[in-house]
Amino acid sequence: MIIKYPDGSQKEYESGVKVSQITGDISEGLLRQSLGAVVNGEILGLDDKVYEDSDFKVVKFEDKEGKQIFWHTASHIMAYAIQELYPDTKFAIGPSTETGFYYDLDLEHRFVEEDFKAIEDKMKEIAKEDLPVEKIEISREEALKYFKEKGQDYKVELIEDLPADEKITMYKIGDFLDLCKGPHLLSTKKIKAIKLLSIAGAYWRGDSNNKMLQRLYGIAFEKQSQLEEYITRREEAEKRDHRKLGKELDLFSMHEEGPGFPFFHPNGMILRNNLLNWWRGVLEENGYGEILTPIILNEALWHRSGHWDHYKDNMYFTKIDEGDYAVKPMNCPGSILVYNSNNHSYRDLPIRLAEYGIVHRHELSGALHGLFRVRTFTQDDAHVYCLFSQVKDEVFKMIDLADYLYSTFGFKYSIELSTRPDDYMGELDAWNLAEKSLKEALEEKNLPYTINEGDGAFYGPKIDFHLEDAIGRTWQCGTIQLDFQLPENFDLTYVDENGERQRPVMLHRALLGSVERFMGILIEHFAGKFPLWLSPVQVEVIPVSDKFKDFAESIADKLHAAGLRVHLDGRAEKVGYKIREAQVKKINYMLVIGEKEETSGKLSVRKRNGEEVQDVDVDEFIASLKEEIKNKTITD
């Protein structure tokens, strides 16, 4: 078999060679650092074997796949420690996540943070022993017998739900044996730093009809210094938590009367409307027409589009005049109906249709998280209908739009190309052509990208944009998707130069993504200190006493007349208190108005960062703020 490496080189091996041998043949140093490999898009551990021609990429801890292996093993070590300390525990599931790992546990003892140290100490003890992590393949009957004897009901249920011919794998660390597909580290010794983070409730299988389990979250690293750096970042992230700042800045709230459905307050609507109005203008300048399509559409539409098979478990349904309808989880079919409502010539293409469409998806209650994970959100979708010869140019334009959007907010970004998933729709040749087109577009733009095997949409491959925020976290936001399938499903056509009907190509594009989620990211990225153009209140006017209130009002009125968002704090409170409160609200500028200001007609300006400027002309102050707004300047 042939093993192909990322640099294009290749080597021949006998079938059945271990990942560790292939890695070691590259270099012994690399083997010492490696945690596994991505083989034909699948993550394998060092002890796993390769049986066929493969694309082979070694992964280390800094790679997301490496972290997945590392943290998965850490979750098993945590479970082993808990088995030692609380022998009656029943274990549910314990995966790695993007930010660490957790294990869902069923036991009488209710965990509190004071329990964490004993568990951490036991985990460190296990890790230090350099125990091998052994993969064991057994029959379904043996696995059921083992877990029934142990009283591990959740594992029994998981096995019984597997297909009859499913291969059962277990992993063993010391005296702890767990049902698991893996992959894992070779041994426990690489895990040098461990911290338990929190405890939460989680229904078994996410179903509120099932028992509430205890979910214990943790993190682990190769070095203590990495853990210390993580703790610092986590503390900063907690200060920036958009749920906390959303309340402090009076932007939005969540209520038990509508879990997962955000309520935006006036301040939040100013932020939202300024963001969307600006983006609307950008899209108009770039040749997009805006549409609005219904929230509720006939159920048959979702069968035709293919969304039914992929989204039905997360959709909301209703009946209208005895007909079956669904609340839309996606905007694409509505856009398609708009396109199909007219005849089109090749001269009309490309047609660019943008929509700020409200979609609904049923998320499990345990998955809801502020604005990041909601049940209703506005998606800044656009769909471009074009000739195949226009695809590359349209993708170029979309990439340029993405760059303009993200750089406006000071985000750095990386790009992933996500390829054909297992549940893809359509013909393989069309998929290969679509993937090739997106690759060529990225390469002609000289943009570095990584391949995310098997993570494309069911109807086409996609380019994903991952933003890096002010404290180094990454967020997947924008996406560009190439689709040959939905035009086929909906019989989309245009008339070519010969008068023949032809099929257009459809490009899906969302760059903000979920507007609510993007707002949450902005809140945390800026820590609530928004650029002036987005700030709900741009200037706070603070008279030092009632004596100067009239002059302060005249200044506030002049600023307001100039189009600035101004608040006059005329309360009978001490000036220092009012300044501190304005700082807590993260208002960009504070104007303290007293005798000197009234006499001179000049302003004393205090910036959000504490910098003070005296004797500022009112008109010059207004002009400088207008310039800051126009340039979308990022301060602080």
Predicted regions located by residue number:
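NTP/phosphate- and nucleic-acid-binding module
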Residues: 1-92, 97-636
